[in-house]
């Protein structure tokens, strides 16, 4: 899914994000807004980018079809994520960053309900820093 020329650049961004998340005590970050997807993946797609503080990032794609690569999974709705993670042996995050300033209230509540973190933080403010 990620072109060879972007891999090093994106790894630097992911490592910088992980450093910030670790300092905040955050387990993972879930992004879905176009500008944040483009910044973190080099592409815009309908779906989610999941970056755990430890481990590989996941590309959770709703549309378009045809994207493939390492850690790419197709989902039809966010409720598909917990069973997918359970199948892959990925722990659900206790502390999760969501794009609070950019998602609609309903989208935010839906994602919070899907992940059921003990604590949710604001990924929007995090991404701006």
Regions flagged by a language model, labelled:
Residues 44-49, 55, 69, 77, ...:
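Generic alpha-helical propensity signal that fires on short helical segments
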Residues 1-58, 90-92, 122, 127:
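Terminal domain-start leader segments
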Residues 52, 62-64, 104, 119:
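Helix N-cap / beta->alpha transition motif
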Residues 32-34, 61-63, 98-103:
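Structural motif
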């Amino acid at each position: 899914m990620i072109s060879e020329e972007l891999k090093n650049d994106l790894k630097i961004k992911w490592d910088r994000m992980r450093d910030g998340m670790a300092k905040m005590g955050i387990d993972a970050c879930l992004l879905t807004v176009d500008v944040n997807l483009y910044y973190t993946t080099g592409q815009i797609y309908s779906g989610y980018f999941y970056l755990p503080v430890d481990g590989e990032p996941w590309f959770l794609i709703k549309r378009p079809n045809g994207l493939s690569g390492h850690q790419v999974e197709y989902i039809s709705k966010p409720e598909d994520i917990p069973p997918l993670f359970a199948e892959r042996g990925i722990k659900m995050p206790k502390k999760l960053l969501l794009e609070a300033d950019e998602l609609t209230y309903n989208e935010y509540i839906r994602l919070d309900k899907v992940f059921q973190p003990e604590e949710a933080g604001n990924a929007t403010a995090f991404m701006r820093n």
